[in-house]
Amino acid sequence: AVDNSDIKIGVSIWSSTDVLGSQCKLILDEAAKALGVQVQYVDQGHVSEKVTASVEQLAAAGCQGIIICNSSDTEMTSAIKTCDDNKVYLSQFFRIISEENSADIYQAAKDSAYYIGAVHEDEPANGEELVNILLNKGDRNIGLIGWEQGDATWLGRWEGYKAGVEKWNADHPDDHTADDGLEGTRLSRDPPPGFL
């Protein structure tokens, strides 16, 4: 039997020091303490090359499991292969592979003996709720900015955002949102100079 103190869990995270990331780290640190396991973090900034390298780094560091917040589905191809090759368990948090838009990657995850799943929110419902909060506060010129092409989480939020805008515009014919929500599409593909 393996002693819990010999178990090391790797965490590939965008940042362990920003507002959300630091809270995630606090929770994971407490869970690791309660279970008596080790935890090791790699901050990857949602840069694709760093995301895939973080999985390789954590596997090489002897982690038996890795939880990852990737920035796009395509990164999961490499992450799954690295974990399969090294017999390291892999799960996602705040992300999910899109069965519809990334069918081959989704299938690779299903076929993997080491990919164990994902924990994520109901992103379409989140997107709709977020746009409704803004609309109810009086905002009409609302844009949604995505981080990385192929991010299934952002695409789910965008789906909910559009649904919320469409419902609002149908229910409020004299009080539409600017550009009927199209501004968000433009911004997500072409952020303003100096934005990032």
Language model: regions and residue ranges:
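A residue-level marker of the well-folded mature domains of exported/periplasmic proteins
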Residues: 1-196
